[in-house]
Amino acid sequence: MNSKFDRIIHHMEKLNYTWDEQFKDTGLVCEQLEKDEFQPDVIVGISRGGLIPGVMMSHKLNVPFKPVHASTRDFPHWENYLPRPSDKKILIVDDICDSGETFEKLSTYIKENINHECDVRFMSLWWNNESEFEPHYFVKEVAKFTNPVWIEFAHENWWI
């Protein structure tokens, strides 16, 4: 263990989220979008966790994909490719919505600086249902404050 962060995670319950689960759940989210009749103009994948499901959804829905490096630590410095002012329907994707703070800040930034009339929606494969922010689309829920758990995504440990 190299850091305080590693020691904290070592003592938490771990949930292993496999490639098969992620592929299946990403497909389920695409079905939710279709049922909701929401066809985004662009999918924004938050680095790093939102890149894989974002790219998968981009191919399935035949929609442009834009990666963005966004975290609450970096706010308001958003790197890479943000939506264009002409993008009216924007789907922002991440692997997990823990507190929702990154989603909220990115939504505010887009609406204040790019297009204040756009429809910004959020998708995460996992949602911490004890946070105040609820994404529009998600597949799995966890109560991370009551039951501290670390969700280990396949892309985080594929070489082990």
Regions found by a protein language model. Give the residues of each.
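PRPP-associated nucleotide enzymes
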Residues: 1-160
